[in-house]
Regions:
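Extracytoplasmic gating/loop element in the C-terminal half of outer-membrane beta-barrel translocons
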Residues: 162, 466-570, 574-575, 593
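Conserved SET/PR-domain catalytic core that frames the SAM/AdoMet-binding pocket
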Residues: 341, 431-432, 442-456, 553-558, ...
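Extracellular/periplasmic, surface-exposed regions of secreted and cell-surface proteins
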Residues: 1-37, 48-377, 535, 539-639
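Aromatic-residue-lined binding/catalytic grooves and analogous aromatic/hydrophobic interfacial grooves
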Residues: 384-386, 437, 448, 594, ...
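Glycine-rich, aromatic-lined ligand/substrate-binding cores of catalytic
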Residues: 437-474
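Intrinsically disordered, compositionally biased low-complexity regions
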Residues: 44-45
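Conserved small-residue
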Residues: 218, 225-230, 328-440, 471, ...
Length: 639
């Protein structure tokens, strides 16, 4: 259960000149989870057998959270004459978060129908408690100035302190500055643009923000007593008695501070034809420094892993475009209005610093593009055993019979020309036949909408999508691999008929008999996509999926009855409507599988997905709860 309450107060101290506002938010969470397990005995027979569960248990967990947020803001707008506009804002904010957890566990339910710790006889029990807290306080200001609403400048800054950092680096200063020029108000452009140019504004800005989104206590050496919660939950015995103990704490980083994101932006706002057409363009570059990540390697003799700290940096370049057109006309004597709006944006991010001396490809490295996928190149499918024997050695793929290639197997490309498939040491300097085959980051994202209205009939729709994105199904994507994952899995509908190779094994030289049908699925080998070092567990461009998509996010059709008709039945308004969401989706990957939702394929459900490292192209198994189709019919009555 979560309860939230917000209060706000605004004082207009000097009318239209000085205003003071304050707000206070309190959010409380109280959650309890009980888990009971009872004894059971498997039926033992010729078909089914199993291991009995000889013990019963009861577990109780409680979670208590309290969050407070408050701020005070003052705004001064002095009168500086007709052509000058100045606004000064200053404020203070505070956040405080406290979480407490408790867990009680015991074995031995005497009465399973009445679970209670007082009705248990087990010797094994444990009690645990924990929690965390953090606080943040900040001071901020913003100064806006405009001359003739033609030349604009703004300065803003934040000075924030967080309890998550040590005293020497607790505070961070994050300034921003921007300027704008409304060219359309210049007399010299008005004289030449006529009535077609409504607004033209150029913008430039540079600003920084801080990020403290890490767990608290990372800069402290923390220890806990192991075994103190239960007399049976310790392996240390002194004087014939079990006693609690603790361990040497992990190392703490030598640098711990705010992550800093600095963005440089230039943009343009354009309106034409009495504001019927508008266009906005932005070009930006973002630098993220002091990223919280793993630190430099330490000698193995030290006996401790490297602590995480502010050791990495990232750069992102991108652009955003949006256009809008709206107008109206007479159609069959009735007013017809319409509007069309479209947006397109893209960005790419690269690692500019990261501790990875060996260039290990299983983690981040300097120069890496976020989301890149390393894998094997392929050149179709082997048509015969003879062709497979002439290809590179497949001894690298140790998966049962897959010590060599056969007819119907993928034809991997030996990029380094050494006569065998390999991954080398999986480093930048020695990566064998691996190469970059794709990228899982969404690119060329877009949306566009249409709105029409005529004679009380309204129609609107919103489409959205991603123009470029790759996804490789990981080992446990059973809904993609089917029997190539495990023999007892279902055969997917895309793996039937001529979409799968058919192999004639009547001679030693096996031959694929349906190569003319261009089958997508190779010879079926159970666990080829699951077992360690199976040939399909390694990313390859044959099974790399194009996860771009287009989706109809919203469709609304409505009819508003004429006002005269409404008045005759005692109403001031009557409207019928239908709204549908996620009604249509198309993706190139649907040619091979329609078991996944491309919009959420990389987010994943923690109950199913084995997510590895998202930035490294390992997006897990794609088991995400899909975006549901919804249909809504409604009526609006106004009295």
């Amino acid at each position: 259960m979560t309860i939230s309450s917000t209060s706000a107060l605004t004082l207009d101290i000097i009318r239209n000149r000085l205003k003071l506002s304050a707000d206070f938010t309190y959010r409380a969470g109280r959650h309890v989870r009980d888990k009971m397990e009872n004894k059971y005995t498997y039926w033992s027979g010729t078909d089914v057998s199993g291991t009995d569960k000889a013990s019963s248990s009861l577990e109780n967990k409680t979670y208590k959270t309290d969050y407070i947020s408050t701020s005070v803001v003052g705004t001064l707008t002095p009168g500086l004459g007709r052509h000058n506009r100045l606004s000064i804002m200053a404020g203070w904010n505070l956040e405080d978060y406290v979480q407490k957890t408790a867990k009680t566990y015991r074995q031995g339910n005497l009465y399973p129908s009445k679970p209670s710790f007082t009705l248990m006889d087990g010797d094994y029990y444990s009690t645990e408690s924990g929690g965390k807290s953090w606080g943040l306080v900040g001071f901020f200001t913003r100064v806006d100035y405009a001359l003739k609403d033609r030349y604009m400048a703004e300065f803003s800054a934040r000075y924030d302190g967080s309890s998550k950092f040590p005293t020497r680096s607790k505070w961070g200063f994050f300034p921003s500055v921007s300027a704008g020029w409304r060219i359309s108000d210049e007399p010299w452009i008005r004289s030449c643009s006529g009535q077609c140019l409504s607004n033209l504004k150029l913008r430039v800005s540079v600003g920084s923000l801080g990020n403290a989104n890490i767990d608290p206590y990372q800069y402290l050496e923390t220890m806990r007593a192991t075994g103190s919660s239960s007399v049976a939950n310790t392996t240390i015995v002194l004087n014939g008695m079990r006693v609690p103990y603790t361990s040497v704490p992990n190392l703490v980083p030598d640098n711990m501070t705010w992550e800093k994101v600095t963005t440089y932006n230039i943009g343009m706002d354009l309106s034409m034809f009495a504001h019927k057409f508008s266009f906005t363009a932005d070009l930006y570059r973002r630098r993220t420094t002091d990223l919280y990540t793993v630190g430099p390697d330490l000698p193995h003799v030290l006996g401790s892993s490297a602590p995480s700290g502010n050791y990495a940096s990232l750069k992102t370049s991108g652009w955003e475009l949006s256009a809008d057109w709206h107008d109206s006309m007479r159609l069959s004597g009735k007013r017809f209005s319409y509007s069309v709006k479209a947006m397109l944006w893209d960005s790419r991010s690269y690692v500019t610093s990261y501790y990875n001396a060996t260039g290990d490809l299983t983690t981040y490295y300097k120069g890496m593009e976020i989301g890149e996928i390393w894998g094997f190149k392929t050149d179709g499918i082997y048509a015969s055993n003879a062709e497979a024997e002439a290809g590179p050695s497949y001894s690298f793929f140790k998966n049962g019979e897959m010590f060599r290639a056969y007819a119907g197997d993928l034809k991997f490309v030996d990029l380094d020309g050494d006569g065998k498939m390999s991954v080398g040491n999986r480093t930048l300097s020695d990566h064998g036949d691996l190469t970059i085959i794709g990228n899982q980051s969404p690119r060329l994202q877009y949306s566009f909408g249409i709105s029409l209205n005529w004679n009380g009939i309204g129609l609107s729709m919103l489409w959205q999508g991603v123009g470029k994105r790759d996804w490789y199904p990981w080992t446990e994507s059973g809904f993609f691999w089917g029997k190539w994952n495990r023999a007892y899995n279902a055969l997917m509908k895309s793996q039937t008929g001529d979409n799968r190779v058919k192999v004639d094994k009547s001679s030693d030289n096996w031959i694929v008999t349906n190569m003319d049908k261009r089958p997508y699925w190779t010879r079926m080998v159970s666990l080829a996509a699951n077992r360690n070092n199976g040939p399909l567990t390694w990313e390859n461009d044959h099974y790399l999926q194009d996860a771009s998509y287009i989706r109809l996010k919203n469709l609304t059709l409505d009819y508003t009855f004429p006002l005269a008709m409404c008045r005759r039945i005692g109403l001031s308004g009557l409207k019928l409507y239908f709204t549908g969401e996620n009604l249509f989706t198309w993706s190139p990957m649907f040619r091979h599988t329609d078991m996944f939702d491309p919009e959420v394929i990389s987010s994943g459900d923690s109950d199913f997905e084995n997510t590895l490292t998202p930035g490294l192209g390992k997006t897990g198994n794609g088991y995400s709860y899909p975006m549901l189709k919804t249909y809504t019919f409604g009526i609006n009555l106004t009295f």
